[in-house]
Amino acid sequence: MPAPAPISSVQAEALRTRSLPPLEEVRHGVWSLSSTVGDRVEGHSFSYLVEGSDGSLALIDPGWAGPDAVPRLEAALRSVDHELSDLTLVVVTHLHLDHLGAADDVRRASGARVAMHALESAALDRRAADGAAADADVARWGAPRELTEALVASWGSGRALPAVTPDLLLADGDELPVAGRRLRAVHTPGHTAGHLCVVEPEQRLVFTGDHVLPTINPGIGLGGRTASNPLDDHLASLRAMVPLDRPGADALEVCPGHEYRFVGLAERAEALVAHRADRTLDAVTALDALRAEGAGAASPTVFEVAERMTGWRGGLRSMTGFVLASALAQTEWHLRSAGRADELATD
């Protein structure tokens, strides 16, 4: 299925030219602004300002932390006749640095409250324990020794996460405290356990963070350990998007965390579900081939299965660090979802 067409020509052009798009009005009282991810313009993230009927503002995803984060926000606010003191709420869709990073800086500068899902807050609190457990995952995957140090550094105990304590914990269905707005939190686990989308039904907008993007297939399980399978969570969250959308003029406009705004939430969610089904089949086919070739031999490792899969762009051996770790974790989750994880090596 082709990628959805962009609603914003400005954002589409910035994506094409690898430049940073300017502040843009999405609807009356709603603006998008962009920020670099570290020093990189490519892959920039979006924040969204939403104005309440009393003149207060909510900020959805403050973006990457850095010396220019608050001055950039302050300049954007001035351009729409607001100031930092108008900001009363910072909503975090998920715990990644390109979305959450500047939350503390913005809170200190404005006095705004920071809100996130309770599971994201819990993941931040237990990041040390999760990192140690992830080190054990790396060992179990069976990657070559020369790759394991980078895997631990990027996925396990060496991975950096911010220390942010929220003022307000959100749950599925909660209405955000923005005057005159019906902004509703929708819990969409998968990318991370406490990922949130925010729906504005009156203006037919949905802010999707990294849950649904127009061309990128979002990673899963990237927010700490969970008792459930992140893949199964992700699929359920994608399917939950479909009934939110409507055909024609009442369709939701998707305001994602990256790339560009678009219409076609239901179709894009269904395409992502289909993509995951293809990946599950790829993993099962690779496992079957390895077991057929090695009948009576030791069970294959996660790395061996992933290396045999055909869906990786450039092949598994082209990956290192975090990207490789994510691929290996996803391989295991696909096999777990298919009921085949017990056929993998466990040590």
Task: Tell where the protein language model's regions lie, with residue ranges.
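Aromatic/hydrophobic pocket-lining residues that form the small-molecule binding cavity
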Residues: L73, H234, L238, T331
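C-terminal regulatory/interaction regions
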Residues: P2-A12, R16, T285-D347
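Residue-level signal for inorganic ion chemistry
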Residues: G29, H258, A283, A338
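Active-site HxH/HxHxD metal-binding segment of metal-dependent hydrolases
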Residues: G43, A65-V70, A76-P177, R204
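Short Pro/Gly-enriched beta-strand edge/turn motifs at strand-loop
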Residues: P4, R27-S35, S154-R159, A179-R181
